Amino acid sequence: MNTFTLGLIVVAYLLSLAYLGFLGYKKTTNTSDYLVGGRQMNPIVMALSYGATFISASAIVGFGGVAAAFGMGIQWLCFLNMFVGVVIAFIFFGLRTRRMGAKLNVSTFPQLLGRHFRSRNIQVFIAAVIFIGMPLYAAVVMKGGAVFIEQIFQIDFNVSLLIFTLVIAAYVIAGGMKGVMYTDALQGVIMFGCMLFLLFSLYQVLDMNFIEANKELTAIAPLVLEKFKALGHQGWTAMPITGSPQWYSLVTSLILGVGIGCLAQPQLVVRFMTVESSKQLNRGVFIGCFFLIITVGAIYHAGALSNLFFLKTEGAVATEVVQDIDKIIPYFINKAMPDWFAALFMLCILSASMSTLSSQFHTMGASVGSDIYGTYKPRSRNKLTNVIRLGVLFSILVSYIICYMLPHDIIARGTSIFMGICAAAFLPAYFCALYWKKATKQGVMASLWVGTIGSLFALVFLHQKESEALGICKALFGRDVLITTYPFPVIDPILFALPLSVLAIVVISLMTYRK
């Protein structure tokens, strides 16, 4: 497909986003509209927005490449995304969050915990962690989307990053939560349609059915590269050797880190407060589950089965054909699928990036504008909306600058860094706000501090992937990690920080609880 046709498709896509952003702007009349869609969003729109925000481009391209390299063990992440990220999140967290949010009349995650525990310090602390930590996460998505546009249209990276940022900024700043959720829903439909087509066409390309393809994938286990065998790789339909470096990376970082970390993502939690009733929230469970099964399950499956395609066409497995794991899925799509689908897949990647990024910008803007500035400088409702818009703009500028300032190896770890901190710092306090009446504000503050500092300490001094990239431990102690004894360097920080955070909130709350 030529560049002109691609350009027309992208222009039509951008015009659709512009219209939906304008629609959100027209329907936004107060701060509640801007922050939580007036609590009257359609449950289908909410569920699609939740799923589209959940699934970023890194989940499609990055984790799809991981599946191509290491196999279907990553499908456990798909299961946790569905079971924890939707079923548990909606039923056990979402219902109570919606009721509590309406009762306390709050519009953000920091406000939810701050007002529940009657502590301004809790609200400001959570907002500060979001505003300081999330730009690094956003920079990952921004850079990924800009690089993708650069490669497709052969334009300068600086130009593609600027265009990409301006488009998202326009509909987030103007349309607020309604603009974000309307565009998320469209992007979710595009992602779902692309993955559904990929799932059905994959077996036609391989000329096999489901059982035949999986048997064949099992049979080629001896072709695993030696460097991956040394890490514990046993084949594309088997889990890695228990206790091996690959096993720890898959189980602690990807399956547990991402699978559990999603429960305390502020940009996801706020979605529960956008619908009018618990009945509407329940309707979103099936839609969310079905969306994640297709979008995530299809790409992980396609990643693993791409090895059969490359063996058939090029006589080698995926990691021999494409050295860079992040480029395996785009290369496979271009080689195996029709040209028109390659163009749609490009929109799928852009949609995944933009839906995640728009929610991040909105959350950061709400944190700095409403939760921090609005707390110390109370304003009228109309003025507060404009302050939040300025907060969104400021957050976008900070994330934009980070794309240029930080080295690639640090930015590349941004997702795991932020999700790990969110899980360790926020999850115990969030759970206790919903389920444990003996939790006190002193216990929550202790948990927030312990979770945040524990995560940062583990990232800087214990977990090798981040500590090597940051270089602080090396500069201070002359080695990449403090504890070199295996398996400590490969255990995800969440397994250090989350238990300490839970312990802190339980112990301090019991010590300070008064009937």
Please give the residue ranges for each predicted region.
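Membrane-embedded helix-loop-helix hairpins and adjacent transmembrane boundary segments
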Residues: 1-515
